[in-house]
Amino acid sequence: MTNIRKTHPLTKIINNSFIDLPAPSNISAWWNFGSLLGICLIIQILTGLFLAMHYTSDTATAFSSVTHICRDVNYGWIIRYMHANGASMFFVCLFLHVGRGLYYGSYMFPETWNIGIILLFAVMATAFMGYVLPWGQMSFWGATVITNLLSAIPYIGTDLVEWIWGGFSVDKATLTRFFAFHFILPFIISALAAVHLLFLHETGSNNPSGIPSDSDKIPFHPYYTIKDILGALFLILTLMLLVLFSPDLLGDPDNYIPANPLNTPPHIKPEWYFLFAYAILRSIPNKLGGVLALVLSILVLAIIPLLHTSKQRSMMFRPLSQCLFWLLVADLLTLTWIGGQPVEYPFITIGQLASILYFMILLVLMPIASIIENNLLKW
């Protein structure tokens, strides 16, 4: 008799996705981040659900309700800080996951890659709206500055911003709708992640060499289940170290001051994971130009598959491309640092140079390096 695991309509899907799935025998720890992102999403949904039970999305009580969660709710402080720092862990995993895709040529699965870009935008939108909810100074002014960017859109900009605000400034209506969107988006992200996996399983996983691995596959369970559990333990260990020892390390002290529309903080800046994009936005003196550069800094990922000029898929055997890749990583770290600095000399110039280099590497230097490497193969 056939195992129920392989015949029952529900368990069959789980079996084919996580148990009997044929996986390449040589995928490294860089392939762990997909499962880690899934775990991050589950942690965020669960902690978020418990926070939503005690949170009130009203300008008069939002700040107090978060304080109440931390002081009066049983283990409310740990739930709140797991949610806040869980977002940081989520973005660490996201950036490493995208970086892996760039390095090993995983973008050659166009459907999986494009759904991934949509997922990235969705997670960024969710994180932004979540940052507004505690209704501290940085919440309020961050919401004001970022939503105001839409006013740069010609003709409809101002109307669009006022429509999103639900009034003439960030106020009660804005907070309520941001809470509604922040609650629903993670479930949309879950559905998109399922589609992401669906497309991935149509082709099977890529591997570090970039060479088809059909001739050498191993079952996902137990080999990669145990590997994923090890990764999950590292993730949870790091998260709990952050939560229990320095929960405010990545936050902004200004967010412990209740939102005040009459008092602007000296330096308005987003959470650390948006700083690279914020630096690109600020490096262009024109408002519309800055907004376009901001969107393109992520959207540029969509044209990476079209710019793949190399005869090899992975960067494993391409030293020139490797150098450019790590230069890109250094450039993104520089942009992240600049995003948190005040708008003054020399930071403005460094930010502009780093922004130009970011787009230069991805759009010009990488394709050229690939062509050079193709010619070196003939030697």
Swiss-Prot record:
It is found in: Mitochondrion inner membrane. The keyword Membrane applies. Heme b b562 binds at residues 83, 182. Binds 2 heme b groups non-covalently. Keywords: Electron transport, Heme, Iron, Membrane, Metal-binding, Mitochondrion, Mitochondrion inner membrane, Respiratory chain, Transmembrane, Transmembrane helix, Transport, Ubiquinone. It is a multi-pass membrane protein. The keyword Membrane applies. Its cofactor is heme b. The chain crosses the membrane at residues 33-53, 77-98, 113-133, 178-198, 226-246, 288-308, 320-340, 347-367. GO terms for molecular function: metal ion binding; ubiquinol-cytochrome-c reductase activity. Heme b b566 binds at residues 97, 196. GO terms for biological process: mitochondrial electron transport, ubiquinol to cytochrome c. A ubiquinone binds at residue 201. GO terms for cellular component: mitochondrial inner membrane; respiratory chain complex III. The cytochrome bc1 complex contains 11 subunits: 3 respiratory subunits (MT-CYB, CYC1 and UQCRFS1), 2 core proteins (UQCRC1 and UQCRC2) and 6 low-molecular weight proteins (UQCRH/QCR6, UQCRB/QCR7, UQCRQ/QCR8, UQCR10/QCR9, UQCR11/QCR10 and a cleavage product of UQCRFS1). This cytochrome bc1 complex then forms a dimer. PANTHER family: CYTOCHROME B. Component of the ubiquinol-cytochrome c reductase complex (complex III or cytochrome b-c1 complex) that is part of the mitochondrial respiratory chain. The b-c1 complex mediates electron transfer from ubiquinol to cytochrome c. Contributes to the generation of a proton gradient across the mitochondrial membrane that is then used for ATP synthesis. Belongs to the cytochrome b family. Heme 1 (or BL or b562) is low-potential and absorbs at about 562 nm, and heme 2 (or BH or b566) is high-potential and absorbs at about 566 nm. This is Cytochrome b.
